[in-house]
């Protein structure tokens, strides 16, 4: 028990400085955005769906792998847990209690996310151009890159037309797939504190609370741009 407590304390102390790092802003966020991206929840996991063109320009191997597609879904997580054909208790404990290698899971999305992931929870986020660029930078920096700046392909992905890539940073108790999503939101200018955003519920609840605050006429999060439930189109 003392060992586990020590691990938790150390995790709390190091979580804010763990890769992938939040992209910090030097300007105030815009109130309205035109760049449409999606936050997707699959069970206990969350990730982003973004238009493919710009991220493929930044990471040409994505274009080589997926070709001319409208969107790509990105998720970050534990290498062993994410790629496992069978989830065991030992694998779960290892992923949670001990820093492990990470992967990026990239999925070709041929239509809008709310249609493609009809059985998942999907939210739409409207970003300004600067906020969108910052989110794409965060996603790009979530990939491990070799000395030539190339991303490294691993195994095929787990659903659809998908691929695993070697990730940047380690997965552990206080640096989970959902905290990665929170870091992405923070990088995009959303006023969210990633520290304890460790579960899918904590991410999606934040989105719902923010939407409710918008409905009441006061966001309570002055640095955030509008979120809506899909389907929704940014203006």
Locate each region found by the language model.
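Residue-level signal for mature regions of secreted extracellular proteins and peptides
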Residues: 9-10, 227
């Amino acid at each position: 028990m003392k060992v586990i407590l020590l691990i938790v304390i150390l995790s709390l102390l190091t979580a804010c400085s763990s890769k992938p790092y939040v992209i910090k802003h030097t300007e105030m966020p815009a109130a309205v955005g035109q760049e449409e991206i999606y936050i997707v929840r699959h069970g206990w996991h969350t990730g982003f769906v973004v238009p493919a063109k710009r991220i493929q320009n930044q990471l040409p191997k994505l274009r080589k792998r997926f070709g001319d597609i409208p969107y790509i879904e990105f998720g970050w997580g534990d290498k062993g847990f994410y790629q496992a054909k069978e989830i065991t208790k030992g694998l779960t404990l290892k992923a949670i209690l001990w820093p492990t290698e990470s992967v990026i899971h990239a999925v070709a999305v041929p239509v809008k996310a709310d249609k493609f992931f009809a059985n998942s929870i999907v939210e739409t986020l409207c970003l300004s151009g600067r906020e969108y660029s910052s989110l794409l930078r965060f996603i790009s920096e979530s990939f491990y890159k070799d000395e030539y700046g190339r991303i490294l392909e691993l195994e095929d992905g787990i659903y659809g037309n998908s691929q695993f890539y070697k990730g940047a940073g380690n997965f552990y108790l206080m640096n989970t797939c959902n905290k990665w999503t929170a870091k992405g939101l923070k990088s995009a200018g959303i006023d969210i504190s990633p520290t304890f955003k460790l579960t899918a519920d904590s991410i999606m609840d934040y989105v719902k609370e923010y939407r409710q605050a918008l409905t009441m006429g006061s966001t309570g999060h002055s640095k955030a741009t509008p979120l809506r439930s899909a389907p929704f189109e940014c203006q």
